[in-house]
């Protein structure tokens, strides 16, 4: 049995000021066993008599909604790629569940095109933890599931389950039926954590529910409050084997449980200045990891925010690393100066002042690189990223402080230290590490293997910073979200 695999993961932040385009590249035919990442099943490898066939190179990005012309081209190219396949028994789509084309669900548009062109092809969907899919998606395929953990460190295991369920569906051994239960809970990415209360109860609870032989898969999707759409909020999806009423009951009970736990959620409250000062005063061994939540590129923020940069310089932080500042103009200046030369320039804040203004800095160019590197986060270990031409700057701060800053030409997920290491920075020598991440950095900093203990943080501090990924939802003006919505409105 051959099942096609397509991964198009783009998180659309409707508060971003620039639309994005997506480019689809066919999977190299001579490289069927290319590694999609250490935490994902390897396409081209058979298991249980099933061959998972990669069709396109994975797309992994975040930013504004997708330009309609770009998405139309993507659909046409994907259909052409599928038409060129000799035989496929089924198809798996890996998506975020938040891709938007203008105000329309990209996943729904994609699924409709595939169903129209290939009506007999059964499709299963592996969605991100932030998914908020329209109900119409489930009318086209009921086989939709996602991770049990936030962040989704169990992605490979959930994909394995989906492959096996899709194979059983193809063989007509099961008849999947999906039940949905929504709650208009707007959960910022920073609080989507199953490593602490109250959501730490979810992984074991969902696993227990799936022990029922009539229940095929259960997922709690946290939602994505940075997409102002009618479907915004938390969704429980229960997929049963032709047991619709059982699914509805289970979905309602789980949704009520999540809703009833809302007042137990611990929201980030530290400012970036407070977080850095607290880390500077802490004498414990190991680095202190600070997350710049408002400018988290994993949520579609531009990564050019300067709140953390300003705070670290103003407080005179030492042995501190900031990764990263997206500033292609600064990169051009750095390239003209070269390695080892003194430099003065304005850094960050060039296009969107909601994340801060350019900061005049002075320092030394320590290293310049191409910006291509392999991720080492368990979310997608081994995935090749391209941050564009990048540099390591050592910048002078107050009180004889010095700050190492990674500057990149384009945004990528700054939830790990892969780019810093690629530039030659010895991250194990840093007392404070600041990442442009809301929550996904927790995927690696809570792991002890295979990552060296020298880079595991002694503590993690989530700082509330300005930007289109901030956990402070009062920052946003919603127009499409259904009201009342928690925590915006009183219940």
Task: Give the positions of each predicted feature.
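N-terminal amphipathic/basic leader segments beginning at the initiator methionine
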Residues: 1-48
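Glycine-rich phosphate/diphosphate-binding loops that line cofactor/substrate pockets in enzymes
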Residues: 1-2, 54, 80-91, 275-288
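Hard-cation-handling environments
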Residues: 3, 190-401, 406-407
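Active-site histidine-anchored catalytic micro-motif
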Residues: 4, 9-11, 68-75, 83-174, ...
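Short acidic, glycine/serine/threonine-rich loops at helix termini
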Residues: 15-19, 66, 103-105, 134-139, ...
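Low-complexity, highly charged intrinsically disordered N-terminal segments
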Residues: 43, 47-82
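Cap/lid and interdomain-hinge subdomains that line or gate substrate/regulatory clefts
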Residues: 51-56, 62, 95, 99-101, ...
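Extended hydrophobic packing segments that form well-structured cores
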Residues: 76, 259, 374-491
């Amino acid at each position: 049995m051959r099942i096609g695999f397509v991964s198009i993961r783009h998180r659309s932040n409707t508060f971003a000021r620039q639309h994005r385009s997506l480019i689809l590249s066919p999977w190299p035919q001579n490289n069927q066993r290319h590694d999609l990442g250490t935490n994902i099943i390897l396409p081209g490898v058979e298991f249980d008599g099933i061959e998972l066939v990669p069709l396109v190179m994975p797309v992994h990005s975040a930013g504004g909604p997708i330009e309609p012309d770009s998405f139309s081209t993507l659909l046409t190219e994907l259909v052409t790629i599928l038409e060129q396949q000799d035989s496929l028994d089924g198809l798996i789509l890996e998506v975020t569940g938040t891709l938007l084309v203008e105000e329309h669900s990209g996943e729904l548009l994609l699924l409709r095109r595939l169903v129209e062109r290939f009506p007999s092809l059964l499709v299963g969907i592996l969605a991100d933890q932030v998914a908020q899919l329209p109900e119409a998606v489930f009318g086209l395929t009921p086989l939709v599931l996602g991770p049990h953990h936030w962040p989704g460190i169990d992605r490979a295991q959930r994909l394995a389950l989906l492959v096996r369920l899709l194979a059983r569906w193809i063989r007509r051994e099961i008849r999947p039926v999906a039940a949905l239960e929504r709650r208009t809970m707007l959960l910022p990415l920073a609080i989507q954590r199953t490593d602490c209360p109250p959501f730490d109860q979810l992984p074991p609870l969902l696993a227990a529910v799936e022990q029922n032989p009539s229940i095929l898969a259960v997922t709690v999707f946290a939602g994505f409050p940075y997409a102002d759409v009618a479907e915004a909020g938390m969704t429980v999806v229960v997929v049963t084997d032709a047991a619709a009423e059982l699914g509805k009951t289970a979905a309602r009970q789980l949704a009520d449980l999540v809703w009833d736990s809302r007042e137990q959620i611990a929201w980030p409250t530290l400012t970036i200045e407070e977080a850095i000062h607290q880390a500077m005063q802490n004498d414990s061994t190991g680095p202190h990891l600070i997350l710049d939540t408002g400018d988290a590129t994993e949520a579609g923020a531009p990564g050019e925010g300067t709140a953390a940069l300003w705070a670290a310089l103003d407080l005179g932080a030492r042995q501190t690393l900031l990764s990263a500042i997206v500033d292609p103009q600064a990169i051009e200046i750095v390239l003209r100066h070269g390695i080892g030369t003194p430099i003065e320039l304005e850094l960050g804040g060039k296009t969107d002042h909601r994340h801060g203004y350019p900061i005049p800095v002075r320092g030394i160019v320590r290293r310049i690189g191409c910006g291509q590197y392999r991720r080492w986060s368990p979310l997608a270990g081994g995935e090749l990223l391209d941050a564009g031409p990048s540099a390591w700057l050592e910048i002078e701060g107050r009180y004889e402080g010095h700050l190492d800053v990674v500057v990149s030409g384009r945004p990528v997920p700054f939830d790990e230290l892969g780019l810093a290491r690629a530039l030659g920075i010895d991250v194990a020598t840093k007392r404070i590490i600041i990442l442009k991440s809301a929550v996904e950095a927790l995927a690696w900093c809570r792991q002890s293997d295979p990552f060296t203990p020298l880079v595991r943080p002694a503590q993690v501090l989530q700082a509330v910073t300005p930007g289109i990924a901030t956990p402070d939802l009062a920052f946003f003006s919603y127009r499409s979200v259904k009201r009342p919505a928690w925590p915006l409105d009183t219940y």
